[in-house]
Amino acid sequence: VGRQGDALVNTGHALVSAGRLDKGIALLEHGLTKGGLKRPDEARLHLGQAYLQSGNKARAIDSFKAVRGADEAVELARLWEIHARKP
């Protein structure tokens, strides 16, 4: 189950990077819903970045706030949240 979620997240991130935001966001969301991810906070960070890139600041901020833990993803998420709140 976890590998499927990770594969969905990885594919979603690649699609977002290629400019296919809608499909990439859908796969990132689906991968997070499946659960069992190796690095769920990193996936939430990527989802927040994708939302921000698509212009959805509110969902981006929610995704950044959902990043928990004690690694660098949390610090990055806080910085991205500050960036997302700029007018």
Sequence positions of predicted segments:
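Generic helix N-cap/helix-start motif at coil->alpha-helix transitions
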Residues: 2-9, 38-44, 72-76
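Structural marker of alpha-solenoid helical repeat scaffolds
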Residues: 34-36, 69-70
